[in-house]
Curated annotation (Swiss-Prot):
Main location: nucleus
Pfam families linked: Linker_histone
Biased segments, Low complexity type: 177-187
PROSITE patterns xref list: H15 (PS51504)
Molecular function per GO: DNA binding
Domain H15: 41-120
Role: Linker histones are implicated in chromatin remodeling and/or transcriptional regulation during spermiogenesis, the process of spermatid maturation into spermatozoa. Protamines substitute for histones in the chromatin of sperm during the haploid phase of spermatogenesis. They compact sperm DNA into a highly condensed, stable and inactive complex.
Expression sites (tissue/organ): Sperm.
Protein name: Sperm-specific H1/protamine-like protein type 1
GO biological process terms on file: cell differentiation; chromosome condensation; nucleosome assembly; spermatogenesis
InterPro entries for the chain: Histone_H1/H5_H15, WH-like_DNA-bd_sf, WH_DNA-bd_sf
Superkingdom assignment: Eukaryota
Extent of Basic residues compositional bias: 1-35, 126-156
Amino acid sequence: MPSPSRKSRSRSRSRSKSPKRSPAKKARKTPKKPRAAGGAKKPTTLSMIVAAITAMKNRKGSSVQAIRKYILANNKGINTSHLGSAMKLAFAKGLKSGVLVRPKTSAGASGATGSFRVGKAPASPKKAKKAKSPKKKSSKKSKNKSNNAKAKKSPKKKADSNGIRYQAYRYRRPRGGARYPFRYQAYRYRRPRGGPGTQFAL
């Protein structure tokens, strides 16, 4: 029978001889490709329909089948399974906004049937011009009129606290002499206590 000390030694040797497990390698992440900045946006279904109708130049309008063929031939990466439903929505939107119009031959058609034409672009509303404020006229004429009206009025007498009255007189040369404009001269009147009024020139 082997001793317990030998068994413990053999176990320690077997543990020491066992190979060490290598740590699991981390999976490398593949770098994501950056998206191209400013890439061209895909055209809308309505814009593709308008381009197809204008390119075909049919006066009586272009049929839905012809428009579909043109879109598939001139646009890459289009999902054909979703194109039919997208065209129906685009036709309804175009008729509502006035971008697309039905000719007389297919006036009774509805939905994505019949033929279509490009409608006239709605005119952009012009901005209303601001009304110019009228310029204020110089008030020189009004001032001159008011001054002339004041001159024509008869002069008023003004009483002073001392009982002195002032009155303006105008003088003009006689008819035989030289003509001069009216001259205005102010006079002061004062009535003495016991006698007639005396005149004093200012």
